[in-house]
Each structure stands twice: as C-alpha cells, then as structure tokens.
Amino acid sequence: TRRLHQMQETPPPVDRGVLMLYNTGALKDPNTYNSILHIADVKPYLRKTEYLIPLDYAYPVYGWGVKFNNNKFVSIVSSEDSSVADNEYIRYERPTFAEILEVKNLVEANFGKPASGNILYHLDKKQLENYAHNEIDKILAY
C-alpha cells in the first residue's frame, strides 16, 4: 500500500500496489475540514507522472466523529455512541460521493486508470448505506 506522500519515492520491490486515498488530512487539527478525504489535501500530491508499478486505488466510503475538548483532540467516535461534555464537540466526517468522484477523476488524470480496479474502504453494509447503488458503481468503474 502507498500513501500520497510516498508517490515521489521509489516503489518497493513488489509486482503491484494500492494507493490509499483516505486519511488524507490532519485528524487532530480542529481546523481540518475532513481528515478522511478532502480535495485540498490531495491536490498537492498530484503531478502527472508514471509510477513504476501498477496501482489500484482505494477510496473511503466510511465516516466517523472526531471528538475535541477545548480544541484538543480526544478520540475518534462513532455517531451512535457519542456524547459530549462541557467544552467538547464532535466534528463528523464522511466524504460525499461528489468529493470521492472529484478525487477519483484527478487521481486518474495524473496517475492513469487503475491496473485492475478500484477498492472501497471500509466495506461495511451500514457505511455503504450512505451511498446510492449507482454512486458505488461509479466509484468502482474504471
């Protein structure tokens, strides 16, 4: 697996890889818009280049809450079991279909189509319910 910041490095000695397009932002920064996926965090790493090994792309289809107390990171929480005390708040994050598609289009324009397919991460029925079937199909298409 590769992260965006590793794309300028020499690839490891493997036959193929997966570019992880999630957890792109600063989770613990209270000013972060969405630490799971945000186009502003992805764009600086996109430079038209050919990577030396075939890559597939993994896109996020999950969400979570990031709890802060007095603007200091406390924990990652699920939306079902999250409560807040005084001076606490939760930043809920989930990439929209439009955000995922925008990143997908930019990644493919810069690094090419995936070698054998796209990957959805985190493949969970409850998380997938946040996206329509045709949206999932468009994310997976290559």
Language-model regions, residue ranges each:
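Substrate-binding surface in catalytic domains of secreted glycosidases
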Residues: T1-N69
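Substrate-binding cleft of secreted/luminal carbohydrate-active enzymes
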Residues: D56, Y62-W64, N69-Y142
